[in-house]
Amino acid sequence: MLDGLGSIFKGRFNLNSLLAFTFIACCVDAASCLVEVRVPCCAAFCLEMTMAMAARCQRRSTEMGQMDTLRKAVRLKGITKISDYYGGMPGLVQGEAEVEDFMDTYSLPSAPEKVQGVYALLSLLICIGIAVFAGMLHGISLGVQILATSLLVAVPASFFISYTRPMAVLEKRLHMVGTVLCGWEGVKGLSGKAAFPLRDEDLFPLGSTKLNGVKFYGRRSPDEVVALTASLITAAGGGLVPVFQQLMKNRNVEEHPVKNFQNYGTGGIGGEVCGEPVLLGSLNFLQDMGVVIPEGTMVNQAVYAAIDGQLCAVFAISYAKMRSAAAGLVTLCGHRSVTPVILCGDFMLTEGFLQSKFGVKTRRIVFPTREVRNDLLNRRPDPEAAALAITTRDELVSAAYAVTGARSLRSAATLGTVIHLIGG
């Protein structure tokens, strides 16, 4: 109640302010009850008071959790919106962030809280009007009784926690992945239809892709095969680059320039290296390109290398399924208004591979052409743009939970406000 009175002096009116007036009306009515020997409205007021205290506790817990997340942070990354990013949709991209992005917005009242304040003020004025009219007709005692009763009836008790409860539940979930939302402005900015770019390090962080072994075919020397294939993979980019660069270093071979590079988009790439046509890709890709594959070379996850139309090597690759990446991708694919856009340079990350690896439905995942990918990768958020959410970990699940959680919070808070307005 003191918070409510303090808000009035600051030029704001909220549910706690209405609760303070309700307390005064109930106290005056209780004094009349002693004289008239009737039961006051103490039970109903105690229920509203309990809910108001619960809302304050939840808000306090949310703020402490957010501060604790930022306190433990080593590096901050922000989620910023870029207009007209892909297919007419804005993009939610990650960039640098500062603590001020959160501190400037976290204490601002949200849209549901503003609606609550307007509703509380209107309810107070209407209740006073009804009480004055009743007092003029039936006396002051009945007017006070009607004022106290109408104020209690005007606001459902659960209205106090219609926003703070969903926010507290979401904060606990975000705290586990090291993420905070930048106030209601961040919630609004993360809502609506948007594209979410996914890079190689999002799906398979550094160290999750390893070389399990290699088998060479034909008469070419292994060093020559490694040099040609590694050069082509370096030109393609992606998570395989560190693996093959380490292989080149171990064999003490040099990288060569690549000409006529081409990404076929079906799990394979090609180009000319030292005047030799080189093809790299999955087993099905090389077979479709007319390369003869000997029997007994069936490997589930492998890069097949063909030079001048002849199979020269099979590199067995291990893609470790990280729980954070899997949880983030599943979460993004579960929201219709979010469109994941694959910007990975790794040609092995095809639609079929992602479906089998992560068990997600890929019909909503977009696989743009190489030219479009390069254009999107070069787009950077405005340095002056405020961050909508801040993540403290380099994990896909941290950003994904912020996006989907903000949408769920806005829906829950809006629905709760509408229901309580109708109920009041």
Ranges and model annotations:
Residues 1, 29, 45-74, 80-195, ...:
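Hydrophobic alpha-helical transmembrane segments
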Residues 2-7:
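C-terminal ends of transmembrane helices
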Residues 9-20:
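Cytoplasmic-side transmembrane-helix entry/capping segments in multi-pass membrane proteins
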Residues 25-35:
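Hydrophobic alpha-helical transmembrane segments in multi-pass integral membrane proteins
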Residues 34-46:
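Loop-to-transmembrane alpha-helix initiation sites
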Residues 112, 218-266:
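ATP-binding catalytic core of ATPases
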Residues 250-354:
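Signature of the cytosolic headpiece of P-type E1-E2 ATPases
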